[in-house]
Amino acid sequence: MINDIQKTAEGKMQRSVEVLKENLAKVRTGRAHTGLLDQVEVEYWGSMVPVSQVANVTLLDARTIGVKPFEGNMAAKVEKAIRDSNLGLNPAAVGDLIRVPMPMLTEERRKDLIKVVRGEAEEGRVSIRNVRRDANDHIKKLLKDKEISEDEARRGEEAVQKLTDKYITEADKLLTAKEEDLMAI
């Protein structure tokens, strides 16, 4: 029973860290990376699909992303989708290649983005702690119903706390890496 609670808690904590990683990837730094366009969708044959499914997304240099649609007639739609995404990007079509230059971040904008990133990280940590609380509540309920002993309950809570510490440390590492990325010029 305790093992099931631990496995469930670990899965939820892992998911919280994955969501944090996805949310941090959405925050634009001054450096180009192909993952920046993962959330951008374009209409293709009546349905919305990610840009990466209708175009080849590559890095042209450290500050420019190249997007080459598989079909030439998609270039205008892809360019419009990138421009309309709220990433603050200004793509320019050069033949069948769409160049997406990364604008420089001002010091003020960097500080604002760091605040956003710290908020995202705190949400991730809170999510992890909520999973811990739920797991501990479940363990306490089992103890109250006399399905487990006090020793098993204590060991279970200690194991859940170790998982919590592990995943909060992982979230903090993601935050530190993103902050360093934002402050790098």
UniProtKB/Swiss-Prot annotation:
InterPro entries: Ribosome_recyc_fac (IPR002661), Ribosome_recyc_fac_dom (IPR023584), RRF_sf (IPR036191)
SUPFAM superfamilies: Ribosome recycling factor, RRF
UniProt keyword annotations, A-Z: Cytoplasm, Protein biosynthesis
Taxonomy, superkingdom: Bacteria
CDD domains (alphabetical): RRF
Single GO BP term: cytoplasmic translational termination
Cytoplasm found in the keyword field: yes
Coiled coil residues, start to end: none
Molecular function per GO: ribosomal large subunit binding
Major localization class: cytoplasm
GO cellular component: cytoplasm; cytosol
Subcellular location: Cytoplasm
Family of the protein in this entry: Belongs to the RRF family.
UniProt function note: Responsible for the release of ribosomes from messenger RNA at the termination of protein biosynthesis. May increase the efficiency of translation by recycling ribosomes from one round of translation to another.
Annotated protein name in UniProt: Ribosome-recycling factor
Record organism: Neisseria meningitidis serogroup B (strain ATCC BAA-335 / MC58)
Gene behind the chain: frr
